[in-house]
């Protein structure tokens, strides 16, 4: 009888070990399937691409600017889009307009400070000869930056923030970077606060084909 009880206890122990191994294997299989699905996600729908673009570059959705070029081509610039010429009845930015920008049909710019006086990025318009000095300063701070040439052939350096910050902090952070790099540059945002009457500077959106 004692031997039978010991044998039964041993079987129960083995059963528990086997069940634990089964659970462990099931979890490993589930993790591998999830990892495989994530790795297979190499293509995105049109709306997903636009959402990614917006998450990076669009500082505010309620106001945006569009490039205007005179008929003779001598004058051009970005101006806020409004319903009339009153100047304050701004038209919100839509996915349709962003798609048109990405297709090269229109040329848009975003304002760098949102309606809550927050910023999601800082950017610099620098001379080509200063890019190495700026990059050295960014490297020393552990900051990753992205470079592009805008439609005016100016070098733009984008630094994306992990989360939106008060524009005052973002502006002073940008000034700190320039001081550390010992360079001068046009800064986005170019002020600490924005109001409806004074929106702050806008920056040309990239990836315009």
Positions of PLM-derived features:
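Catalytic "initiation/cleavage/transfer" segments centered on a nucleophilic residue
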Residues: 182-209
